UniProtKB/Swiss-Prot annotation:
Protein's membrane topology: Single-pass membrane protein
Pathway membership: Mycotoxin biosynthesis
Lineage, top ranks: Eukaryota, Fungi, Dikarya, Ascomycota, Pezizomycotina
Enzyme class: oxidoreductase
Originating organism: Diaporthe leptostromiformis
Localization in the cell: Membrane
Protein name (record): UstYa family oxidase phomYc
Length: 256
């Protein structure tokens, strides 16, 4: 055998196992670093997105319906989401004309009746628990031919009825109210009805507790040098829409 081209292989010329694995391990390490970078970037994006979402949620104003539901017990009107707020400055000085004030006339009486006399409504029996009524069977229902709803009406109309009755009571010697059922009862019951209405109005006012500041306008004609300015800025529920809703959702037919 021709050994002229043969050179002995020395031990140091043979690559070790670790040296043979080096390229593979280098590739693996590089791939791991890329995945780590990707994970860090994704985490960063996620954190930024979360912070942005929290900022948006924290600065978003709740809707009128959301606020109303937090401040009121259950109401089928609020469930329908038809609440509308109005902002305005009312005119309400001491002698401010109004279709609802002054010496009784047929027109004034009719105007008051149109405020509070609306049909009754129905709402689901399952909602009675939201009104803290645990025995629905003890309360009037709509006739079964129209469903199994509870029979009721919105409290604002009871409050207006009470205010009207107190108004009429103050004019009972100046106007013929013989057609008013409440005044045909025995005097003790009439007085009790009026006192009930005064309590209803008192509680309603205290419950709402309007905290809008009343300011004083300078007036040299007054001994005090100023007068209360009752032309106040108001934010109110749109009463016409509430009344329209009650009429549109009126219960028809006989009641049980």
């Amino acid at each position: 055998m021709d050994r002229s081209g043969y050179f002995p292989v020395l031990d140091e010329d043979i690559p070790t196992k670790s040296e043979l694995r080096l390229p593979l391990e280098s590739k693996t390490s590089s791939r791991s670093r890329r995945w780590l970078h990707l994970v860090l970037v994704l985490q960063f994006v996620l954190i930024i997105s979360l912070l942005a979402s929290l900022h948006i949620l924290g600065n978003r104003q709740p809707s009128n319906i959301t606020c109303a539901k937090q401040l009121s017990p259950y109401s089928p009107y609020l469930e329908d989401g038809d609440l509308e707020l109005e902002e305005f400055t009312e005119l309400n000085h001491l002698m401010q004309p109004s279709p609802y004030r002054g010496q009784p006339t047929p027109e004034i009486e009719e105007a008051w009746v149109r405020l509070w006399r609306v049909p009754m409504i129905g709402f689901p029996e399952t909602k009675m628990i939201n009104l803290n009524k645990t025995n629905p069977q003890d309360y009037a229902h709509v006739s079964t031919r129209y469903g199994d709803d509870m029979l009721g009406f919105l409290n604002v109309f009871h409050q207006l009825h009470c205010l009207n009755l107190v108004r009429q009571y103050t004019y009972r010697d100046d106007y013929d109210y013989s057609n008013v059922t409440a005044f045909r009862a025995p005097q003790e019951l009439v007085r009790g009805h009026i006192d009930h209405c005064i309590e209803t109005i008192r509680k309603s006012i205290m419950c709402a507790s309007d905290v809008t500041p009343v300011v004083f306008q300078l007036d040299d004609s007054r001994k005090s040098g100023f007068k209360s300015d009752f032309n106040m800025r108001r934010t109110c529920r749109n009463f016409d829409k509430i009344q329209d809703w009650a009429v549109a959702n009126a219960v028809q037919g006989d009641f049980e």
